[in-house]
Regions:
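Short, solvent-exposed, charged loop/turn and helix-capping segments
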Residues: 71-88
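Alpha-helical segments in soluble extracytoplasmic regions
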Residues: 47, 51-72
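N-terminal intrinsically disordered, cationic/polar leader segments
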Residues: 1-54, 90-121, 127-147, 151, ...
Length: 157
């Protein structure tokens, strides 16, 4: 017999349900986990509890970086078509920079990498919502690390 590999995809219908908020949440989480890792490393004495905690923090940080890459690739590859690309021809370069920064966040524990990634994600988010004709505004995230994110201005009920 042969083994069938597990395959995952967005829906490929296309469903038209795309939202970069998951990417923003993951990027904020990366910065938060970098902060927690660096706090943990400030302790002069590393012990098994610290090491276990560091292992968990690094693992979850890397999961979020992987999610950033996956979600950005899905929106870029499935949502962005010729009309959006014509309007924003630099989106390919932006996506490449996001991929590189997400990898850097996996490789290193430097806060500035996470903050720079968030800036690129915010730019991607602005472009995404603009392609849908939805205005955006900048707000502080209501949880640590309390950095600026781009939010769509939604219709009131």
């Amino acid at each position: 017999m042969f083994k069938i590999n597990k395959v995952q995809a967005h829906c490929d219908i296309p469903c038209k349900v795309y939202d970069p908020s998951v990417i923003q949440y993951s990027t904020l989480s990366i910065v938060r986990f970098i902060d927690l890792i660096n706090e943990e490393l400030k302790d002069a004495e590393l012990n098994t509890n610290n090491i276990a905690q560091l292992s968990r923090l690094v693992s979850v940080k890397e999961q979020h970086a992987k999610e950033v890459k996956s979600e950005v690739a899905t929106i870029w590859g499935d949502y962005f078509k010729e009309p959006q690309i014509s309007k924003f021809p630099d989106v390919h370069t932006l996506v490449h920079e996001i991929m590189q920064l997400a990898s850097k966040c996996k490789q290193e524990n430097k806060r500035e990498n996470g903050v720079e990634l968030l800036k690129k994600i915010n730019k991607f988010t602005e472009i995404f919502w603009e392609t849908k004709g939805i205005k955006t505004e900048k707000k502080y995230a209501p949880y640590p690390p309390e950095l600026v994110i781009v939010c769509p201005i939604l219709k009131s009920v």
